[in-house]
């Protein structure tokens, strides 16, 4: 089983979640799990993943969204 890097960006204002995600994708070749609060942040993280040639899968959580980038 592969350890998954987690970026907890809940409660942060844009563009912080995107910047933290970009940094994690730059440093991690494996999967990255990003936690965000707002729907537009989820969409931005998914778009960033797609732009980097990675696949993103989102699920709604109690306090926002979890986006797993592979």
Where are these regions (language model features)?
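An N-terminal amphipathic alpha-helical segment
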Residues: 1-28
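Amphipathic alpha-helical interaction surfaces in cytosolic regulatory modules
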Residues: 16-23, 39-52
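Intrinsic-disorder/low-complexity, polar/charged segments enriched in Ser/Thr/Lys/Arg/Asp/Glu/Gln
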Residues: 4-6, 31-33, 64
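Short glycine-rich, basic-tinged beta-strand/loop micro-motifs
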Residues: 25-37
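C-terminal edge-of-domain segments
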Residues: 56-70
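Short, structured interface segments that constitute the first stable element of a domain
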Residues: 1-2, 36, 41
